[in-house]
A protein has these predicted regions:
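Active-site HxH/HxHxD metal-binding segment of metal-dependent hydrolases
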Residues: 22, 27-28, 45-140
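Soluble or luminal CAZymes and related metallo-dependent hydrolases
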Residues: 45, 131, 188-192, 231, ...
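Conserved beta-strand hairpin/beta-sheet module of binuclear metal-dependent hydrolase folds
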Residues: 2-53, 160-174
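A short catalytic or substrate-binding loop motif that flags glycine-/basic-rich loops and adjacent residues
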Residues: 24-26, 133, 152-155, 318
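Metallo-beta-lactamase
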Residues: 145-236
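Active-site neighborhood of phospho(di)ester-bond hydrolases with catalytic His/Asp-centered motifs
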Residues: 41-44, 59-70, 83-87, 150-153, ...
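C-terminal regulatory/interaction regions
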Residues: 238-318
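Short glycine/proline-enriched coil/turn segments at helix->beta-strand junctions
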Residues: 35-38, 55-59, 76-82, 164-166, ...
């Protein structure tokens, strides 16, 4: 049964944390609202609450941390308002077909599933941004100063927001959840994901806000950063172990290295498994730790049996 009870709203000066339904788990996320300026960030928390928020306090513009559907589910409520997003993430919201292309969805049946899902559950409508948010920008909203931070990897134009006066950092989908980072889109990057996480952990914030699940971390999350990064290396190590013998892409996907077991709907979970494994194969092939022979992948024989990839997070950041 889906848990529908909401977490409590929290406020740090003009920065309001609006919890998502089901504790911000997909397909929901936590939203932010900036009082005074009327800025709403990532409108996919709770539809009724967002309607109430606009009616009682006013919403003047919507900002998106990135283009994913679970961060714009209720954007349709604000069709008449200015929309700000990074330029690199803009193409994905320009049409349903481009959205699917950015996910790397090729199979016709999966595209049909996602097309229906986007339109019916996520109320997707093509949008053209009013302005572009750029990493390095400092925006004075009168009630608070916002530093826009470029955090690519999850998506090419992924953004975080540091609210200077209350020292609050919104990390978006770098959520420190046990599942680990997502970097399975067509234009995602493992290397950029690692760099962005290591950038965020150094921000001098008193409060770290994430787009999903726990949502609020008072003080630096500490070991949670390493645990989060380690998921990347654990996935890679398991893949390397699986490639002790030649494997096709289909065999790799069926091994369920990411999700642990076959799950439904396949159009969602098989797509995710394939996307993440593809990124790891690209990374391992580039490092010559894996070779491709025809339609099969195999671990480089020069890698000693049982020797795993060193985990840089265990020594680089304490």
């Amino acid at each position: 049964m889906v848990e529908t009870k909401l977490m409590e709203e929290q406020r740090w000066g003009p920065v309001w944390f609006i919890p998502g339904q089901n504790k911000g788990r997909y397909p929901y996320c936590h939203s932010l609202y900036i009082e005074g300026a009327g800025i709403l960030i990532d409108p996919a928390s709770d539809r009724e609450r967002l309607i109430q928020l606009r009616k009682e306090h006013g919403v003047n513009a919507v900002w998106l941390s990135h283009w994913h559907e679970d961060h714009l589910m209720h954007l349709d409520l604000f069709d008449d308002l200015p929309l700000w997003i990074s330029e690199k993430d803009t193409p994905a919201i320009s049409s349903v077909e481009t959205f699917l292309d950015c996910y790397g969805i090729e199979y016709h049946g999966y595209r049909k599933y996602w097309r229906q899902l986007l339109e019916e559950e996520f109320h997707f409508k093509p949008r053209k941004p009013t302005k572009f948010l750029q990493g390095g920008q400092t925006i004075d909203l009168s009630t608070v100063t916002v530093e826009v931070i470029s955090t690519p990897g999850h998506t090419p134009g992924n953004l975080a927001f540091f609210f200077r006066e209350p020292k609050v950092l919104f990390m978006g989908d770098y959520d420190l959840a046990k599942f680990g980072p997502w970097y399975g889109d067509r234009y995602s990057s493992i290397e950029e994901t690692i760099d962005s996480i290591n950038l965020l952990r150094k921000i001098p914030a008193n409060v770290f806000l994430a787009g999903h699940e726990t949502g609020i971390f008072r003080g630096n999350p500490g070991k949670r950063w390493d645990d989060y990064l380690n998921v990347i290396f654990d996935r890679e190590n398991r893949l390397l172990q699986f490639l002790n013998q030649p494997r096709t892409m289909e065999e790799i996907v069926e091994a369920c290295i990411v999700y642990g077991r076959p799950r439904e709907p396949k159009a969602f979970f098989e797509l995710g498994e394939r996307g993440l494994m593809k990124k790891h194969l690209e990374r391992l092939t580039k490092a010559e730790k894996v070779f491709q022979e025809g339609n099969k992948y195999i671990k480089n024989a020069a890698i000693q049996k049982g020797k795993l990839i060193p985990n840089p997070t265990t020594t680089d950041h304490k």
